């Protein structure tokens, strides 16, 4: 049986945690930052976790993670 391919875009966006979850970065923090409030940018800074609703999609994209 052939190996399952990893979705490379997902591999660059998500990192597996010790408890089986996945870390992710928040969106909206790349460009056009001058019109966004400092508070909004500060809250987007820390890493988040993938929600349980989306976990199945991420696991399917990363079969060897």
Swiss-Prot record:
One biological process term from GO is: translation
Query: Per the record, a Pfam family?
Result: Ribosomal_L35p
What keyword terms does UniProt attach to this protein?
Ribonucleoprotein, Ribosomal protein
Signal sequence residues: none
Gene3D superfamilies in alphabetical order: 4.10.410.60
- Is Ribonucleoprotein set as a keyword in this record? yes
Q: What are the GO cellular component annotations? A: cytosolic large ribosomal subunit
Q: Which GO terms describe its molecular function?
A: structural constituent of ribosome
Record keywords: Ligase included? no
Provide the family line.
Answer: Belongs to the bacterial ribosomal protein bL35 family.
For this protein, the record's PANTHER family field holds: 54S RIBOSOMAL PROTEIN BL35M, LARGE RIBOSOMAL SUBUNIT PROTEIN BL35M
Q: What is this protein called?
A: Large ribosomal subunit protein bL35
């Amino acid at each position: 049986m052939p190996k399952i391919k990893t979705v490379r875009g997902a591999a660059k966006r998500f990192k597996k945690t010790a408890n089986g979850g996945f870390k992710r970065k928040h969106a909206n923090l790349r460009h056009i930052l001058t019109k966004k409030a400092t508070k909004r940018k500060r809250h987007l800074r820390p890493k988040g976790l993938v929600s349980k609703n989306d976990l199945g999609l991420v696991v399917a994209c990363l079969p060897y993670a």
